[in-house]
Amino acid sequence: DGVCATALAPPGNCTDHPLWPPVVGDWVALADAAQNHGEAAAHAVEIMPRTSYIERPAASGFGLSQAIAANVDELVIVEPLQPAFSIGRVERFVAIAHASAIRARVVLTKADLVAGQEIQGAIEQCEPLVESVTALNTTDTQAVAELKESFTPGDTLVLVGRSGAGKSTLTNALLGTSLATGKVRAADGKGRHTTTSRQLLQGEVNIIDTPGIRALGATPDAEAVDQTFTQIAALAEQCRYRDCSHSGEPGCAVGQALTQGDLSPEVLGRYQRMRRESERNELNRDARLARQSQRTASRDNTRGRRETMRLKGRGN
């Protein structure tokens, strides 16, 4: 029989561990199992080393982030074609995948609601970003079966996207499960949060379904942003100045490509906005971590002084 880990707060000082608390996808060591109302309860005492860790930055900035999952092999970006496909949102998710050093793919849903020209346009925008782009209707069993065959058996996938994108519907189709799905408002095409927590569902592939994300900040990893916009990163290597901001400096290869029509101004604009936000989030994150480190050091010093006083009291 399995053991149910009903206590996340472990004995001892495990909460001081840098990996604490555990997130969906974590492997944990359990101890102190005891029978409780016919079920085994246990304390999680250690988090096993992670192969990957995905977090998303808060849209508000301030260096805050929210964990998505751990030990994931592939980020599946579920982006609806209706009511409004957003390449900017896809780019931000791809940057998060690069920051986590995992693969990413794009699944374009609601392909039955738009014209073929729109589908092809969305695919062409996504293709430079990821290795695999699929457009489908989640009720098309053959298309879903082909998508399922493209996954590596045994991999752990995490589905991310906006509310109403069809993540839970896609999960149901892939695994034959029955997660709750919600209706999409006809007025604006936005869905409600039917998935309110992250959960790991096991099958031929392990799928983590996540709540919809309404606003997505830029990863604080500026290098991951450059990895997302590969065309601009390659051009930047040819700029005269290493710290070129691509804003009109002499010898700017990016500006030259823009003038010659080889680079879209919309792509450059999205890159510059994400890069600026990424650098700002990185500064805020580093400042927050420094404050946390100071508080931890102060707490440890206080504990040390108390222990010293206790030992001195014993000596008397």
Where would I find each of the regions flagged by the language model?
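Walker A/P-loop
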Residues: 163, 167-169, 173
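Structural motif
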Residues: 76-78, 158, 207
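Helix-rich effector regions associated with P-loop NTPase G domains
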Residues: 17-27, 31-41, 48-71, 103-104, ...
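Canonical P-loop GTPase G-domain recognition
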Residues: 103, 112-165
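Conserved beta-strand segments of the P-loop GTPase G domain that flank and frequently precede/overlap
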Residues: 76-81, 107-109
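Switch/coupling subdomain of P-loop NTPase systems
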Residues: 43, 63, 70-72, 83-102
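Conserved ATPase-coupling elements of RecA-like P-loop NTPase cores
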Residues: 86-90, 115-120, 217-221
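Beta-strand/loop nucleic-acid-binding surfaces
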Residues: 2-22
